[in-house]
UniProtKB/Swiss-Prot annotation:
Protein name: Alpha-1,2-mannosyltransferase 1
Predominant location: Golgi
pH dependence: Optimum pH is 7.0.
Function: Alpha-1,2-mannosyltransferase involved in the elongation of N-glycans and synthesis of the second mannose residue of O-glycans. Catalyzes the transfer of mannose to mannose and alpha-(1,2)-mannobiose as substrates but hardly transfers mannose to alpha-(1,3)-mannobiose or alpha-(1,6)-mannobiose. Transfers the C1-hydroxyl group of the mannose residue from GDP-mannose by dehydration-condensation with the C2-hydroxyl group of the terminal mannose residue. Required for the maintenance of the fungal cell wall and full virulence, but not for the adhesion of conidia to host epithelial cells.
Region span, Disordered: 48-75
Organism field: Aspergillus fumigatus (strain ATCC MYA-4609 / CBS 101355 / FGSC A1100 / Af293) (Neosartorya fumigata)
Record-listed E.C. numbers: 2.4.1.-
């Protein structure tokens, strides 16, 4: 009699097993035979498998058209801004180095867009290499011919003779025609390119630059929140033989447009005698973060148009650095121009490296502070600190 309960348990287990088998056999959710292949990482690329796509009769929705500076490219909390680079196809590997510097030190955390501009169409290699390196969206634009050619009022024979004379004098880029077109374009047109029109701020990046320190904040956000219009990391004196008549053109502009000259401006950075002469100080424009809205303003466009018609981009060799610097110095208030001491930077042959040892350690810098250019005799950064009554950073006096 003691075996009765045992048999009852066996019968109960058998009944439960039959019930489970019956439910599984009647289920409308079949177990996939190829479950192993479905779990392959290769299938994660598409949210819809190829077999599912074949059975989807509905036409696919068109992709959202992304335009530079649109809501599609500016996540919440990020400023409407872009990096911008003027480059040739042959610059691809040099600009690749620059992109890695910018991405590793800053943009991998922010994913800002990058606009590339060229007077010729970009080739596939340039596009593939740069797109693969930039964490944000990339855009490629061709410069309109009218922005990279001689305006009607320029005597091209006279311009050619000037290039030949400067070449004989061994003035750097003095005999270069393309360099003059580049300087004119950077001075008056890059911010008018259709790809740039929807952005508010830009950060200019050139081939073969280095960023020596981590950038632990968003410079674009600082510019916007503190109402800065222009910024720099290096400043120096311009080569006078390239700009002998530039200040005369500037003074003529100031006389014709006093409404464009700001009170509390940075004239003291540009001139030692209240504007009578130019001391040749300028911000080095191969690094600059600035306001595109300011460059597109009437005051700046009037300024560029006046200089452009005077012909110095071609009859001399006016650079975009003094052109931008003078504009900022006379048309902006001093507090609207910012010095980024924290952004350690190199462009041949000059280095900006923070003098504070603690800052270099905190920002994981790898620059040699003895190579810092800021406080050397040919730099104008001391003058910038002086006119703003700013205290020089720790360690600066040791390098003076």
């Amino acid at each position: 009699m003691s075996s009765g309960p045992k048999y009852m348990r066996y019968l109960l287990f058998a009944a439960v097993g039959l019930a489970v088998f019956f439910l599984i056999s009647r289920s409308s959710i079949p177990i996939p035979e190829n479950i192993g292949s479905k779990l392959s990482p290769a299938n994660y690329k598409d949210t819809i498998s190829q077999s599912d796509k074949a059975h989807n009769d509905a036409p696919p929705k068109p992709p959202v058209k992304e335009t530079p500076g649109s809501a599609n490219t500016a996540p919440v909390g990020r400023v409407n801004a872009t990096f911008v680079t003027l480059a040739r196809n042959s610059d691809v590997w040099d600009i690749a180095k620059s992109i890695r510097q910018v991405e590793d030190r800053f943009n991998r955390n922010y994913h800002y867009d990058w606009v590339f501009l060229n007077d010729k169409p970009f080739d596939d290699t340039f596009k593939k290499v740069t797109t693969s390196l930039v964490s944000g969206k990339t855009f490629y634009g061709e410069i309109p011919k009218e922005h990279w050619s001689y305006p009607d009022w320029i005597d091209q024979e006279k311009a050619k003779k000037v290039r030949e004379e400067m070449g004989q004098k061994k003035i750097i880029y003095g005999d270069s025609e393309s360099y003059r077109h580049m300087c004119r374009y950077e001075s008056g047109f890059f911010f008018r390119h259709p790809l740039m029109l929807n952005y508010e701020y830009y950060w200019r990046v050139e081939p073969s630059i280095e960023l020596y320190c981590d950038i632990s904040f968003d410079p674009f956000k600082l510019m916007k929140e503190q109402n800065k219009k222009y910024s720099f990391v290096l400043s120096l004196y311009e080569y006078y033989d390239t700009i002998p008549s530039l200040w005369d053109s500037v003074k003529k502009f100031m006389g014709n447009h006093p409404e464009h000259i700001a009170e509390g401006n940075a004239m003291g950075f540009l001139s030692d005698d209240g504007g009578k002469t130019y001391n040749k100080c300028h911000f080095w424009s191969n690094f600059e973060i600035g306001s595109l809205e300011w460059l597109r303003s009437k005051q700046y466009l009037d300024y560029f148009d006046a200089l452009d018609h005077d012909g110095g981009f071609f009859y001399e060799r006016w650079g975009d650095a003094p052109v931008h610097s003078i504009a900022a110095g006379i048309m902006l208030k001093k507090e609207e121009i910012h010095f980024f001491n924290e952004i350690a930077y190199y462009h041949i042959p000059f280095t900006h490296c923070p003098t504070s040892e603690q800052m270099r350690l905190d920002l994981k810098c790898h620059c040699n502070p003895s190579e810092n250019f800021d406080w050397k005799g040919y730099s104008c950064t001391s003058r910038w600190f002086q006119i703003n009554d700013m205290e020089k950073p720790e360690g600066a006096e040791e390098q003076s």
